[in-house]
Each structure stands twice: as structure tokens, then as C-alpha cells.
Amino acid sequence: MKTYLRTACLLVLLMGLGACSDSSTQHQRQPPPNILFIVLDDVGIDQLNGFNSSPLAVTPQTPSIDTIAGNGVSFASFYTMPECSPSRVSFFTGRYPFRTGVNAAILPDDLPSAQISPFEETIPKVLATRGYTSAMIGKYHLGGPELNPDGYLAPSVMGWDYYAGNIYGGPPPLDTTIGGQYDADTFGGDPERFSCGVPLGPTRGVCWREDPGQTPQMDYQHGAGYTGKECLALGGIPALDADGQFATTLEGAAAGSAARELLGMDPYPDFSIMNGFYVWLRTQVAQGVLQQSLSREYMTVAETDASIDWIRAQTGQGPWMLTVSYSATHVPFQPPPDNLLPHAGIEAPNCTGGLAQRLLGNQMIEAMDKEIGRLLVGAGLAVQADDGSLEYTPEGSNTVVILIGDNGTFIPIVKPPYNPTRSKGTIYETGVRAPMIVAGPGVAEPGRTVDDLVSVVDLFQLFGEIAGIDVHDAVPSRRTLDSQPVLPYLRNADQDPIRSTVFMEIGGGQKPSGMTIPPCVLSFSGANICTDILFVSEQMCRDTGGTPFGPEGAPPAGLDGCCAVRDAALYDDLTIVPLSAWAIRNARYKLISNERAPCDGPPLEFYDLQATSLTNPAGLDNPEDELLQQGPLNADAQENYTQLYDTARALLASEVDCPGDGNLDKRVDQRDLDGVEANFGGPSVFDFNNDGVTDELDRSIVEHHFLRDCSVPGPLQAARE
């Protein structure tokens, strides 16, 4: 391992990317580089023009991201997990979901076994050994606060010195009542009137604002008024008149207030109601101290502001890693402030239609791109030219910038030639391919693209490589890492492929026993996708734009699964999301194994991903290209099928189940008994039977397996017992 470390140190020093701890190179020590890690939520490879060159794709304008790519290396075959939590846990631990238990987006009902374990060696814990200070700003979604002993303090427990942002999986739902002022049944029965949580259009009107004493006051800007979005962006709530329309005069706003009072409604808007990206719960954790407040700042702007403030506070301190985990473009789709957009005057008519959502998706990315440019300038890494363009010269900095999407794009805004029916939440190419860009001092031949396979778990090793840390030494040997190197691609433009395969998987998380999940159908451009693993409530299904079929859902209500929805013949064509799936691919072929609903198709799928200029230019795994249904495989395909199947089975078998081991050391001993006692009566990672409570049953599981060493191979372990 010393040889590996010296080699890694040499690479780091040659690139100017950091310092090493090996004694033979200490006299050459340089300040370790800072790491700025930018995560775009639900931005797949189809969204950025640097990765999707299809003439059919109307991609957003992203000059800031394009500038980073022009000064760095783009990775065109970067593979994530199909959903956010599994991807995020993978890149912060370097471990596949079947090892961490986080195989699906964490929902409020998921038990601790489906959340990141406090015993994982996360990258902030590893970097701390080299003196790094770590912060995360923005979306968290690794575990908690529900059903987690650490609650809102989870980021601190997982190693981050500072956290500020939205700890949940996405922004809150849109407030279609405009602060409780509008009720569709009372005012015209139009539930879509404020589908974006704000009056749209150029109309200027009255804005409710809170004074320092939190008393609502009407603000008309001396007669100039505000557009609905301007009011919302300022932290206010647009005032409605007596007809439930945007009030264009102070008299109209006063009449609306009086009319609501006569109807038994509150005459003033409710400033406690959350509203998508504009009004949300901000959680801050610093040195284990929790603070929470209701933020009324557009989320992407707030995330950038907090990031710049934190970076500036590190001046003169040691090396740092900042994860800027933007919440865009997670649903709900909502128009950003106009001053963040390059297309003045172009506005979506609503936030529910397919065309409108595609426009909103582009605008949310464009707004985020502008804020990424402001982030680089605020961090001292770039300057704004007179023409507004970004001038970024990473060679003069000591900061490596890594930008990724966390998984594929969500259904409504997928761009051609990628497949919306096989997007986020599925194991198919559109669901697991995302952009990745790395820029920093010493990158060889910037502006190039690497086509070789890179996995999301490899980021863990890249973070270590930048800091001069061998993560395989830093993590306990009994905890298997799946990471492989990335740094050689940055140093050497002619680097041979490092990975031969990438592995992806998705499951249903871990809900309390006996819990049922209502089926939800997501419809888009004639495609209908049914899932009974993603949305734990009918309201969550509705908030995502779906149709629920639970006890109070769409008629016929009470359907007990997607097969029942299919049997009801409600849709001409219904795709059912598998209950769980894994996939493995090499440079050309891809094998998928599904746990399907009883009414669905065969468990195995096999694809040739070689791109064809006309029928499959992106090399996708579309239904018509599935090989096993086309007859016997040819010799080359059969050989690859066998190799991929054997590799996947060996990989899955490498993680040995260890009942009674709660602290991830592959031993069942006194520390596990202590864990049961410390968490007795509540949920925890020591709840081995996943019934939602740590109790006598879990103690008995530890006692039954006491002193078992799960690292010993099966037959030998059986002999020992």
C-alpha cells in the first residue's frame, strides 16, 4: 500500500492538486487543494448542450457550466444511481447501495436501515484526517429527520462541520392558495388559477409584506406595484382582490381582505405557508447546534449566498471542501425570478402542462447556471467580464471544481433523444447517466471529453486523490469500498480505461412492516408510468403531478397495486416500475435484472448499447432494442451476457449479510448490544427486524449471533459456530 500511496502522491504533486503524507515527499508538501463540489438535482445528461448535441433537444443556456467545462474535463459516461439518496450516499461513502442499505430516495416513512448509517466513513470524516473543514449547503437527503435518532442534527453526525439548507428531498409543495387567500370553491372553482404558487404575467399589483413586528402591510411601491414573481422574490405574498384575482390597487387589496373576513377567512395572508422554491424551512447545523427558520429567499439564490459567505469565512484557514447541493431542478417546477433568466418576457402559462414544465425546467437550470457563475466569482475563482461572460482560469487557483448531476432527469422535462418513460427512478440509461465536469489547477489539455466509464462511487476516491489520501487505507478494511481512481483521467489525456464495468441499482427503501403504498400513475405525452414503491401517500403522488389510486384516489379508488391499475384497463399503455432492479454494463453491453410485479414482463433484459446514427444515436436501452426477446444471442453477445451476469452475481455476493451487526464492523459483539440499549424504544440502525423500534427482539438477535465474525467465509463460519 505504501507503493500505491507514493504513486498517488506523485500524481497529485505533478498536477499541483495537493499534498501527500508519505514521509519521502513531505519536503515537497504543498497546500492541499480546496474542493468545490457542485451537485445539480435531477439534471441528467440530456439537459446540457455540452453532453447532448441532438438537434431535437432545446437545451437551456448554461454559459457558466460551459465555461467550467471549457477549462476542465467532461465525463460523458458518468453513471449514477436512479434516484438522489442512493447516488448521494454512494459518492459520499464510495459504496454501492446494497452495502449501505440506501437503495431508494429516502421518504418520511423509511426506517434508519434505509438511511445513511452514522457509522459510515463519509468523505468529510476522511478529509478531516488531512485537516479539511467540510460544509454542505443546500439539499441534504442522506437521512433524517424522520425516524432517525439524530433528526435534524444528522449532517453534523455524518461529519460536516457546517450545514445550511433544505434537509428534505425537495422543496415543499407550491402554495396554490397564495398564503391562504384563495379557495377554488369560493372564487370561481378554478384550481389551476395559481398553479405556480404565484400570479403570473406582467400585471403589477399590491404585495403583502411583513414589517419588523411581523405585522402584514400592503406595499404598492408608490404606485409602481410589483409583478407576482417580484413580490414573491422579495419575500412577500401577492395581494388578492374580492374576486380572488391579483389586486392591482390598494383599494382592491383592501376589498379582498374585507371580503375574506366576511366569508370567515383570515383577512390577512398566512406567512407561515411554505411555497416551493420561494418559502421553505431552512435548517442550519454548526458545531452540533441546530437553528431553523422559514426562509423567504428563492432557494437557488439562498444556496449561493450561503456558499459564498462560508467560503469567504475560510480565508486564512486550512483546506476546505464545500458541497453546494442545489435543489433545482427537483419538482415542483416553478418559475425563477426574472433577473436570473436570459430570456426576458418568456413565461410559462402555468406549472402543470407538459410544454410549460419543459420551459420551466430550462429556466430553472438557466437560473442555477447564473448563480453558479456568481458562486465562482464570489469564491474568488472567476471574474465577470464587461460583457457579462465568466472569466475562469483554474490554473491560478488552489481549488478543484467538480460539477455533477445526481441522477437522470425527471419524466416531464427529458429531452430527446433520451427516453422519458425510462428516466429518473429507473435503471435505464436515461435514469442513470448524468453530466460530470472536473476543473482545477494542473488539468491536462482542458476542454476535452472522456468517454470511459466512471461510476458515482468513484467520486469518493477522487476526493481522496485530490487531498492526497488513499481512501482504501482510510476506511476500515472490513468495510468494502467500490471506488476506483479518477485522477489519472485529469492528468493524462491518453489515459486507458480504468473501469471495465459500472453497476447501478434501485429498490423500495425500508418501510415499517405492514405498510402499504398506493399505486401512482405519472402521465406524460401519451406515456403512463405506474409505481407502487415511490410515493408513500396519495398527496405525495399528487404533489409530483401523478394520479393516485389509493383509498381516496382517482376512481376506481382503492386499487392495491399497479397490476390492479392495469387490470382496470384505465390506460391504453401502462409501464410498471419494477419493485427493485440492478444493472451492470461494460463498454458496449448492458444486463438488467428486475424484480417485477406479478403481471409484468420477464426479469432479465439485455441490450447492445452501440450507438447508431439514425435509430439510436445516444446508445440507449429502449424497449425495441432488448436482445433476449429477439431470439438466440450471437457469440459476442452471449459471451458478454455471461461475463456481465457472473460479474454482477460475484459483486452482490461480496457483501455478506451480518444479522446483529449495527455498527458496520462485520462483528456481532458488545458494541452492538450497547447500541441496542442506547437506542432502546426508538428507531435506529440497531433495529434489526425493521419493525420501527429497537427493543427486546433486536437484543435477542444480537445475543443469538453474539461473537459472530461475518468477515469469515460461510463454510468456515459455520464450522466456527
Question: What are these regions, as identified by a protein language model?
Answer:
Residues 27-73, 140:
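Active-site-proximal N-terminal segment of extracellular/periplasmic enzymes that hydrolyze or transfer
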Residues 45, 307-360, 410-419, 609-612, ...:
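Active-site His/acidic residue clusters
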Residues 53-88, 133-135, 158-167:
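Short, structured active-site-proximal loop/turn typified by the sulfatase FGly-forming signature C/S-X-P-X-R
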Residues 103-104, 110-121, 129, 141-317, ...:
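Formylglycine-dependent
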Residues 147-159, 332-335, 377-446, 454-455:
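Histidine-centered active-site microenvironments of extracellular/periplasmic hydrolases
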Residues 159-162, 166-174, 184-189, 409-415, ...:
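C-terminal cap/loop subdomain of S1 sulfatases and analogous C-terminal strand-loop tails that border
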Residues 301-312, 344-399, 660:
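A long, amphipathic alpha-helix that forms part
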Residues 662-683, 691-719:
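Alpha-helical segments with a strong preference for the paired helices of cellulosomal dockerin domains
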